[in-house]
């Protein structure tokens, strides 16, 4: 029979610490990609409204009385739906401009925020506490550890393969194109990778802010702006 100390440490604390580590890595990596994509040092993973879509879906699941796995699944669906909605709306007449992408994300995030406020206002008191707890961040176990770590490592390996192109893109779009980088394809790839990382992080732990904004800058202060170091460091 397992002792209480063993159960607390290895079945409760360590899995949650591992979840926090993986979620922090996802948000840090998504923050780096988002700052490159938008060419804005103040960009963070939530600027495109992905977390807002996840929050609306998760709160509706809580309101319907779903269990934790169902809530996480609803958050994943909401995050992915929000990501694709931003992508479609930001294309305009076939063009995919960074400014339009940013404005579309900000507007959609504001709209999701209003819906979240409405849900909290009309929900019964019995559900409000659980909703607020999810919005603040919840790292309870919902997915096997190998899935969480696999998502992070796969995304990191893919992003690391484009580190040279990211270095060139950070110098300017015209210069990157003159050196052979397909900037349109690269930006679309950055958008979907950052969106999927953010959706995964929100699904695992709810909306945890600040990490994706600050961590990339901390890594740059310590190791410079070379994305061969910034990506794994974040």
State where each predicted segment sits.
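Alpha-helical transmembrane segments in inner-membrane proteins
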Residues: 1-234
